[in-house]
């Protein structure tokens, strides 16, 4: 079993923003794996399917980025996923635009959504796929930056990164985080 969580903010005003690359990845995986996402008790949208012989669930919290922990915790408990079966996909300003980084766990590195998930799960030991969005912003303008859309040039890079991220997640589902790290880091 695998639970793939993509972080972002709900609402059309956030579509296409840097902070929502996790949501975009879930949408791509949903299409590729023909998994339909449905409302899951108000805190998230959720869909289940198969990849090869593995049960796969896709999830997008609807609690806004910085409050993702309650939705992730609820989905894991409701559907019976363990920590080792979960991977959280999110934006990262510490990586160049389009750069991917897979990790088996670790600190939140300043990402408030990850901090909230760590707080709710009580552990830092869950896999992550970090998707670089760059950090081309002035001091004090981080929020404006992450909530803004990509430039046309950045969008081309991000689209390619999301293709690679889709493949990285499928590798995670097939063989775990270390196989995915060896292939995509």
Report the location of each language-model feature.
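Hydrophobic alpha-helical segments within soluble ligand-binding/sensing domains
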Residues: 110-113
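Nucleotide and nucleotide-moiety/phosphate-recognizing core
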Residues: 2-105, 115-129, 136-141, 148, ...
């Amino acid at each position: 079993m695998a639970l793939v969580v993509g972080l972002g903010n709900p609402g059309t005003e956030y579509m296409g923003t840097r902070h929502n690359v996790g949501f975009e990845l879930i949408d791509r995986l949903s299409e590729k794996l023909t998994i339909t996402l449905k409302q899951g008790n108000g805190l998230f949208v959720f869909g289940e399917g198969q990849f090869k012989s593995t049960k796969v669930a896709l999830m997008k919290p609807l609690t806004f980025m910085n409050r993702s922990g309650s939705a992730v915790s609820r989905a894991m408990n409701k559907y019976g996923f363990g920590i080792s079966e979960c991977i959280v996909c999110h934006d990262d300003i510490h990586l160049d635009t389009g750069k991917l980084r897979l990790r088996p766990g670790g600190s939140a590195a300043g990402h408030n959504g990850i901090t909230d998930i760590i707080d709710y799960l009580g552990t830092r030991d869950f896999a992550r796929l970090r998707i670089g969005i760059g950090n081309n912003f002035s001091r004090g303008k981080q929020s404006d930056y992450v909530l803004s859309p990509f430039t046309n040039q950045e969008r081309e890079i991000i689209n390619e990164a999301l293709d690679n991220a889709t493949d990285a997640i499928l590798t995670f589902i097939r063989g775990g985080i270390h196989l995915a790290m060896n292939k995509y880091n």
